[in-house]
Amino acid sequence: MTLNSDADPDDPEPAAPARDLSKPASKPARSTRKSSSAKSAQGAEGEPRKTPGRRAPRTPASDYRIAEQPAFVLHSYPYRETSLIIDVLSRDHGRLALVAKGAKRPHSALRGVLQTFQPLALSWSGKSEVRTLTGAEWVGGMLPLTGGALLCGFYVNELLVKFCAREDPHPQLFHHYVVTMTRLAHDEPPVQVLRSFERVLLRETGYAMALDRTVARKAVLAEGRYVFDPERGVREAADDLPAQWPVIAGQTLLDMEQDDYHRAQTVAQSKTLMRFLLNTYLGGTPLATRQILIDLQNL
């Protein structure tokens, strides 16, 4: 059953949050029509009249309406007195901000549906930075996250908010998000699940590089010692390289390339490497949930 948003048709769409603005608002085109007296003057002077240009066809209203799109809620925050703005990851449209009008009302059908870590089918309309949610359906089929798995889920959601630009679809990343939530719900080792997701996230957003070959196109050797240049990739360890680049065993890099985390050394060094890379690519911006995980579970 699809639950319709309690949207009031006369309510305006909210302005985009300031931190998410990436495109200047378009300005209405000025009228270029000339008065009849001006046209007559042109005719009198013998200048040829210009044929009015054809107007660009209007975008069909259906292009601004999306129905039953697979999606997950990443984050939500209050908007006005009775509404929410939800940050969602959708399969075919990437990360979007939607206003759920009336979702905070006591008897709103949306209150129990717009939950994190649950597969949803969302419908929305509009073309502004913040679309209007018009319907939400709980799809089901996934176990809820609890305990440490719940903290890991919030960490994954925060990474998506930090790394994924608005309206930049990543179907493979969406698929891996579903896989990650399923693995966490089934109590698979969090370290392996998180490292696997982090690598997919970096690859899909344009940061990841191969771990089994160096920048000099040499094969990584299990017994070798290496560092990871954030701009170029794996390099052989040397004294003249930046001290903040962690030294990683070749075996760790090979294990990570194969998504294999059964060795204790690989678990420890992969955590150090990924923490360094995420911090570098985020420009030093701290991850709130990462610190919680470090404090509580030392992940």
UniProtKB/Swiss-Prot annotation:
Gene3D superfamilies: Nucleic acid-binding proteins (2.40.50.140), Recombination protein O, C-terminal domain (1.20.1440.120). InterPro entries: ARFGAP/RecO, DNA_rep/recomb_RecO_N, NA-bd_OB-fold, RecO, RecO_C. One of its GO terms (cellular component) is bacterial nucleoid. Keywords: DNA damage, DNA recombination, DNA repair. Residues 25-41 have a biased composition (Low complexity). One of its GO terms (biological process) is double-strand break repair. It holds the Pfam family RecO_C. Residues 1-62 are annotated as: Disordered. PANTHER family: DNA REPAIR PROTEIN RECO (PTHR33991:SF1). Involved in DNA repair and RecF pathway recombination. Belongs to the RecO family. NCBIfam families: reco. This is DNA repair protein RecO. It comes from Paraburkholderia xenovorans (strain LB400).
